[in-house]
Amino acid sequence: MGIRKILCFVSCACLLFLTACGGGGGNLSRGESDGNKGSEESMKKGVTIITPEENAEVSLMNELVENVVKDYEPGKTYDYINKSEGDRYFPESVKFSRSGGEGDYRLLISRNKDMTQAKEYDFSSSVTEVSDLFCGTEYYSSVVNAESGEESDVRRFTTKKGPRTVKIGGTSNTRDIGGYETADGLTVKQGLVFRGGNPDNLTDGGKEWFKKFGIKTIIDLREEPSRKRTLISLGINYPELPAKGCACYFHGDLSIRDNECRKGLITAVKVFADEKNYPIYFHCQIGRDRTGTLAYVINGLVGVEHQDLTLDYELSFLSEYGCLDFEQKDVESRKQNHYAATEGLYSNFMKYSISKKTEEPSLKDGIEEFLLRNGVTVEEIKSIREILTGAK
């Protein structure tokens, strides 16, 4: 009897144990379901952008350009000229890093908080760099796993205001003329107009740059025998300028007084009045003086002030091409000539504004009056301003 009681007790205990396990199994199943739900919620946040941090401000300017821009005054760039070092203006990329392990990830960057019109970049590596952002701009970013749909939270960052330099293989002295603020509180749009040296010997990468940025028009400011239409196979338009080419910044207002050079300048300015011509790349031989003159006139016309216009010109001296035609020992004399040239150009346009007898003469009004007297129409000027700044 004692043995049968013991066996009965053991059997009952086993039955209770199995029943308990069965019930526990049911709870475990529910727990797994809840856990999966929690994992799914965690997974959405399992991939995150580590850098840039939320609300970070990043600079697209390298340290040298930052130093020039800080507390800039006309002539400052001459203190940094070093011909032996070649191009030193190249932009900094924005570095992004993420969590999430290996996989087919995509980085999305948009200027809209709802991530509409986002540009997509490969983010398969845990670190990637982006080099085609605008300066002085608010951005939003997120990362998504292309296979699972796993997506990070949206993160905000801004880029610092300043010149937007670009790197184009096979040429030099290249940058966007946008990003500058006007006296009216507007900002010149970026991605529409680029300036630089001649594109006669571009690398394959340089040619890809023109494709990537969708350049539709190239304005060659050189004299006729020097002009080469090396990218016409890409369907790029080359407007015809007078044989003598365009006015030259380094000669101040003297070249603008030259009838043929003035005609070249006016012809080039008119190209900017037609929205179908954008994006535009304009150049001379080394991208400094004739190119600098046109940049001065276009940005001055939309309201950029003299100091920023001279900064844009002086950035040429951080490039290989911008220093080709003088020796390092001649830097000081070049600096003095530069002062005379820039002030001569400024004074010439201010005379046009003063001649209108307005209460507050300005460079913007002076350039406008100069252009009107030489064949550019009111409608063309209005169009240029609207295209480049949104001014109505």
What spans do the regions from the language model cover?
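Ser/Thr-glycine-rich phosphate-binding loops at phosphate-binding pockets of nucleotides
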Residues: 286, 290-291
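Cys-dependent protein tyrosine phosphatase-like superfamily
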Residues: 22-281, 294-392
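Bacterial N-terminal signal peptides that target proteins for export
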Residues: 1-10
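C-terminal motif of bacterial Sec signal peptides marking the signal peptidase cleavage site
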Residues: 17-20
